[in-house]
Amino acid sequence: MFEAKAIKADDKAELYRELAQQLGGLLHGERDAIANAANTAALLFTTLPDLNWAGFYVLRSPDQLVLGPFQGNPACVRIAVGRGVCGAAVEQRRSMLVEDVHAFPDHIACDAASRSELVVPLVRGERILGVIDLDSPLPARFDREDQRGIEAIAQIYVRASDDF
């Protein structure tokens, strides 16, 4: 049985190293993509401060993301590739760090309380499987250290999991 440990880190790099270690232990021996996404979302939501949403969107067709496991308020179920922060991350095949979602062109307001967002694609080889999406009610909540940390989390998730 997995037991989450409180992370007491002096800086974000240390926080994400410890978070990655916990996630590796949590996902060890389990290949189911949905179960692993659910546990990853729960770990992120309960560990990282100042989030109002943490979860996954799954690329179910070449042009559409579908809501996957998450923690937080109910969310948009379908997002077209190219729309909003999640759709832009898939279309551009890169992480998107948005300090002010209200200034982002074509932002999709699934939760009016969200002010900043970090979206990281889940990539296996050349294929995008989906994205990890983090939202915060604070403007500029995320920085490059968060981006690097969540990109590492995404890699751990992809290596540990079968496709959706």
Task: Go through the PLM ranges and name each one.
Residues 48, 110-114:
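Short loop/turn motifs at secondary-structure junctions and domain boundaries
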Residues 139-146:
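A short acidic/glycine-rich loop-to-helix N-cap element
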Residues 53, 119, 131:
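Short hydrophobic/aromatic beta-strand element in the GNAT-like acyltransferase core
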Residues 59-110:
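Regulatory sensory and allosteric helical modules in signal-transduction proteins
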Residues 73, 136-137:
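A short acidic/small-residue loop/turn micro-motif
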Residues 123-136:
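Sensory-domain boundary capping and coupling elements
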Residues 1-70, 152, 156-164:
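Intrinsically disordered, low-complexity terminal regulatory regions
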Residues 116-123:
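A short, aliphatic-rich beta-strand micro-motif
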